[in-house]
């Protein structure tokens, strides 16, 4: 009863302060659920209540729950080596100033490369329209990567992202500095080493853990 009261108080106050519109709290001890309760709504318009069937976008945590997890699995299988340079896995980086950096330094955030690149800023022209070879509102063979029902990505846009990363600058090479740019490259590394698509490789890991609701592109399933 005391646990229930404490959790209720914390979540209700946090929702009232608009830290988030809703939440699901699950506490498991010794393999048993001792607390499982839903609070609030999906969004601040209060239209859809949080339920046990709610699915969450874990956003930047994907770096840990899919990319890093995949590299750990490949490392266990003796397919991925921390002491190898980036160019060992991605030949396209061979003649760049990023190519000789060890992958372990990317994972330790010791490369000194800037934290991120706002790729979206380069996708529109002065009139606010999408530039060629970026996005389109309708599906076609050239714009085949589904993002939303009205937004599709150019199939070779990954090359543009890679080029930005190749050309980006270093901020500080003498200290630990967070950078998420390496994680744009992990899916291709995983695919090359595993001979599977990144989505399928990660999906196999999740399936082995009975994480049936942890996946990419949930609208395909739910």
Region annotations inferred by a language model:
Residues 2-56, 79-81, 162-167:
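Short, conserved catalytic-motif segment at the N-terminal edge
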Residues 11, 25, 31, 55-84, ...:
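Active-site SXXK
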